[in-house]
């Protein structure tokens, strides 16, 4: 069985960039991803949504970000295994064995970039919700804006996703109604201002009451007042429930299910590192840009701490490519 320098678990943005950086430093690297396509949440949940907070990219869609990361990754030698679910990670005599539902691979180090784990959307909470979702009446994320062209759309939620999607939908939908159960939104102030100055119709503090064919009824919180209007589609942005899977015995996790990391992004198991939304430490910020830096930090720490049987390259790309 071939022994690698590094196995990365998770092919989201942080995992893809980590693989590139590891390869740039001269490590032999493989990435294992349970999904059939790489890219994580940006590719699989919101490929057409614009992302604004990545340095040097004023705005980029989830799909384009994935495309760029894969083009970057193509510059270095690597193996990418898709559609494989990691079952366990074991360490024996300083070497990790990573077992999936298809194979077992060995490496000197492991980097977990599994994001927030398996994601399950929070539901609207109505009786026939599953039927409406199967009919396409209710969605929890958007993979194609074309589905909403010329439609009357109601967006439920009060965070950044609900605000961002309302602005995106405004460009293609006939009407967009944003419904939030509170008077104040939880999103970034600048995004809230953009929504308030757009053609999005904001209804606060309202919640779902009833849906009969295309007639949506909202009920005002702590009031008998109601509101009715016609809709074709409902987008629910109440966030996601996560199901973090503990992949290694004795791996320390925080109360929110993320892997505890030290200042070098190493877990309590020597040689097992973590980066991105899968990690937790004091002052942690769950941002993609932060995850990129965490991955670099982890790999640099790994190159100093672990023993490799071949020389490594320096950390500046301008001296390599």
UniProtKB/Swiss-Prot annotation:
Pfam family name, one: Pyr_redox_2
Cofactor note (record): Binds 1 FAD per subunit.
Cofactor (UniProt): FAD
The entry's keywords: FAD, Flavoprotein, NADP, Oxidoreductase
InterPro entries in alphabetical order: FAD/NAD-bd_sf, FAD/NAD-binding_dom, Fd--NADP_Rdtase_type_2, Ferredoxin-NADP_redctase_2
EC number from the UniProt entry: 1.18.1.2
Residues in the signal sequence: none
One annotated GO molecular function: ferredoxin-NADP+ reductase activity
Catalytic activity: 2 reduced [2Fe-2S]-[ferredoxin] + NADP(+) + H(+) = 2 oxidized [2Fe-2S]-[ferredoxin] + NADPH
Enzyme class: oxidoreductase
Annotated positions binding FAD: 33, 41, 46, 86, 119, 277, 318
HAMAP family the record matches: FENR2
Family statement drawn from the similarity comment of this UniProt entry: Belongs to the ferredoxin--NADP reductase type 2 family.
Subunit structure as annotated in this protein's UniProt entry: Homodimer.
Name of this protein: Ferredoxin--NADP reductase
Record organism: Lactococcus lactis subsp. lactis (strain IL1403) (Streptococcus lactis)
Lineage of source species: Bacteria, Bacillati, Bacillota, Bacilli, Lactobacillales
